[in-house]
Amino acid sequence: MSKTAIITGSAGGLGKGIAERLANDGFNIVLQDINEALLLETEKEFKEKGYQAVAFKSDVSKKKEQEELVQFAVTEFGQLDVMVNNAGVDAVTPILEIGEEELSKLFNINVFGTLFGIQAAANQFIKQKSKGKIINACSIAGHESYEVLGTYSATKHSVRSFTQTAAKELADKGITVNAYCPGVAKTEMWDRIDEEMVKLDDSLEIGDAFEAFSSEIKLGRYQEPSDVANLVSFLASNDSDYITGQSILTDGGLVYR
């Protein structure tokens, strides 16, 4: 029987790239996003390519909806094998201007969403009496905090912490928990970060901030979705069975830990 993977935030961007790679690896795919129009478009595209894929619209920041997402996957495909907690949002704000609304939004989605995904998946793995893999979206910002990305960095440090804690607590149940830490990729998220940095610095033009970050990458190019998807594919495979609690950098040589 084919294995089943849930990928949250997979209507576009890195999440879509991860979902497509896992589909090519032979997984049944459960696409999740809050953007219903884009989600259904991606589901249609995947089915046209012959992938076993279904879509589920939900809000990852709601514990009940994360549980419903997992139950949907089990109803559709019989069981769950891999949970990729990919959904996340960013914010570009100087430290003295960070407010309650920003904190609430980013922590609800990036941190609460990840934790609720860990819980829902782990409970299902335990119910199935099967080993399982939980893979979280961290970031270079989970290893090093960045100016005007304070809230985002704080949420990703939290994801790294929950990844370690979950790995320690769930190891005796055969469940591994790891995270992937992307760097600078040409995605809508990075486009937004670039645009917001321009607003904060009159000397910058659109693209300058992205190029400044990219110029520090030792391998000489910005990240493609496939770079992240390749790592997630490994973490979802049996080849990673002896790895847990790690937040692995995939950034082309930008942050060294």
Curated annotation (Swiss-Prot):
Pfam families, per the entry: adh_short
Catalytic activity: (S)-acetoin + NAD(+) = diacetyl + NADH + H(+)
Positions with a binding annotation for substrate: 139
Key word Amino-acid biosynthesis present: no
GO MF assignments: diacetyl reductase ((S)-acetoin forming) (NAD+) activity; quinone binding
Enzyme category, top tier: oxidoreductase
Active site residues according to the UniProt entry: 152 (proton acceptor), 156
CDD domains: meso-BDH-like_SDR_c (cd05366)
GO biological process: one example: acetoin catabolic process
Documented EC number(s): 1.1.1.304
SUPFAM superfamilies: NAD(P)-binding Rossmann-fold domains (SSF51735)
Binding-site residues for NAD(+), renumbered to this chain: 6-30
Keywords: NAD, Oxidoreductase
NCBIfam families on file: 23BDH, PRK07231.1
Family the entry assigns: Belongs to the short-chain dehydrogenases/reductases (SDR) family.
Role this protein plays: Catalyzes the irreversible reduction of 2,3-butanediol to (S)-acetoin in the presence of NADH.
Record protein name field: Diacetyl reductase [(S)-acetoin forming]
Organism of derivation: Staphylococcus epidermidis (strain ATCC 35984 / DSM 28319 / BCRC 17069 / CCUG 31568 / BM 3577 / RP62A)
Lineage of the species this protein comes from: Bacteria, Bacillati, Bacillota, Bacilli, Bacillales
Gene encoding the protein: butA
